[in-house]
């Protein structure tokens, strides 16, 4: 969506690059992590106002072969066990912040990419079997240490006015997918609450029933919002 909008505005070739990237991605059946949240530093300051300019991932140089990027992204889910890292801006950007307007994709084991992992794992089950709760998960800090990115893997480079658009395009799609899974999670939570209330002998109490009804309403509204967003959606210039 956004690469096509950048191309329409600047005559670049980002969209076709991304299409070719996706073709290869699908052919090889790869898995990617979205690498978006920057370290940020002082939240009261913009990227160009930070004491350390590398608190947001930025382009430090470019040549005919590609770009060199530096900085870190935080709390990246599954970075340690994905095939590809797809890097996106994390916020809106101003004209002074062109060097931070960058998007690209690279293999997770790319040269000069450092993944500092934080792993978590569920405790061993002693009494009740829980097959779906036997696997842990991880998130990581991803550090780009003057990392070279070839042009065919660069999807934004300096087009600052599209930084926020690209950040929100990912976030909005992410939230829309959650409209399907989060109501289901809430159903499980409500079931646990209802069962607990029954064991405690308070399932018929008004304040318990009221809170369960409120949760049910929230779950249904989220699900309905997801359907409405899909039905009422419009096509972007890319055809998406």
How does the language model describe each region?
Residues 30-32, 65, 83-85, 100-104, ...:
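Structural beta-strand/beta-sheet cores of well-ordered domains, especially the beta-sheet scaffolds
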Residues 20, 24-27, 31, 176, ...:
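Alpha-helical scaffold segments in carbohydrate-active enzymes
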Residues 21-23, 56-59, 73-77, 91-95, ...:
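A generic local secondary-structure boundary/capping motif
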Residues 59-61, 65-81, 85-88, 132, ...:
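Conserved catalytic-core segments centered on acid/base and nucleophilic motifs
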Residues 223-240:
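C-terminal helix-coil-helix/basic helical segment that borders enzyme active sites and/or dimer interfaces
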């Amino acid at each position: 969506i956004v690469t096509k909008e950048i191309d329409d505005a600047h005559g670049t070739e980002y969209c076709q690059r991304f299409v070719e990237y996706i073709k290869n991605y699908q052919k090889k059946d790869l898995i990617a992590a979205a690498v978006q949240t920057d370290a940020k530093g002082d939240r009261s300051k913009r990227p160009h106002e930070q004491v350390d300019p590398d608190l947001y991932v930025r382009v430090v140089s470019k040549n005919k072969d590609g770009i060199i990027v530096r900085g870190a992204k935080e709390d990246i889910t599954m970075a340690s066990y994905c095939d590809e890292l797809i890097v996106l801006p994390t916020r809106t950007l101003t004209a002074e912040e062109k060097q931070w307007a960058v998007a690209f994709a690279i293999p997770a084991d790319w040269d000069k990419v450092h993944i500092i992992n934080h792993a978590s794992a569920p405790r061993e089950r002693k009494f009740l079997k829980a097959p779906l709760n036997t696997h842990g998960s991880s998130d990581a800090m991803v550090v780009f240490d003057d990392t070279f990115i070839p042009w065919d893997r660069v999807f934004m480079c300096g087009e600052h006015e599209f930084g926020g658009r690209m950040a929100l395009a990912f976030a909005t799609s992410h939230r829309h997918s959650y409209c399907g899974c989060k109501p289901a999670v809430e159903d499980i939570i409500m079931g646990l609450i209802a069962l607990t209330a029954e064991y405690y002998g308070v399932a018929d109490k008004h304040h318990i029933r009221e809170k369960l009804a409120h949760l049910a309403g929230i779950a249904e509204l989220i699900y309905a919002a997801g359907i409405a967003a899909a039905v009422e959606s419009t096509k972007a210039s890319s055809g998406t």
